[in-house]
Amino acid sequence: MAVKIRLKRLGKIRAPHYRIVVADSRTKRDGRVIEEIGLYHPTEEPSRIEVDSDRAQYWLGVGSQPTEQVLVLLKLTGDWGTFKGDKNAVSTVKVAGAKEAFVADEKKKPVLKPKAAKPAEAEAVIEAEEAAEVEVVAEAGDIADEAADGEKA
């Protein structure tokens, strides 16, 4: 079986990202794979390249052939040099720096109003409901008194 290490395309139109996979050379580009050994995101700045070096070395050792694109990625990560016996093979992949934490500008006013006004309104509604209950209880008491007076008469 002819085995190749190649890219499997994922993502939307004009926003591709790839998985580095080991697959039979006769399968479709995005078809069934034997193993996924890494990923490649070309649209990020800098491009994100991650390869499981142990698995890449294994598959290269058993005779799988990388495609041209994957060969370039393996050279960048240093895996191809390691496979060829270069003891000084080093990864030249640039690592993206950490993003800075977001800090709100205190000079600008917030777009949304604070929720402090809403609890006061809620308390007013609760007080109105309690007052309505007291009135209902008082009216019920008046009706009961009238009914009792009507029975006595």
Curated annotation (Swiss-Prot):
<dbReference type="InterPro" id="IPR023803">
    <property type="entry name" value="Ribosomal_bS16_dom_sf"/>
</dbReference>
<keyword id="KW-0687">Ribonucleoprotein</keyword>
<dbReference type="InterPro" id="IPR000307">
    <property type="entry name" value="Ribosomal_bS16"/>
</dbReference>
<protein>
    <recommendedName>
        <fullName>Small ribosomal subunit protein bS16</fullName>
    </recommendedName>
</protein>
<dbReference type="GO" id="GO:0006412">
    <property type="term" value="P:translation"/>
</dbReference>
<dbReference type="GO" id="GO:0003735">
    <property type="term" value="F:structural constituent of ribosome"/>
</dbReference>
<dbReference type="GO" id="GO:0015935">
    <property type="term" value="C:small ribosomal subunit"/>
</dbReference>
<dbReference type="GO" id="GO:0005737">
    <property type="term" value="C:cytoplasm"/>
</dbReference>
<dbReference type="Pfam" id="PF00886">
    <property type="entry name" value="Ribosomal_S16"/>
</dbReference>
<dbReference type="InterPro" id="IPR020592">
    <property type="entry name" value="Ribosomal_bS16_CS"/>
</dbReference>
<comment type="similarity">
    <text>Belongs to the bacterial ribosomal protein bS16 family.</text>
</comment>
<keyword id="KW-0689">Ribosomal protein</keyword>
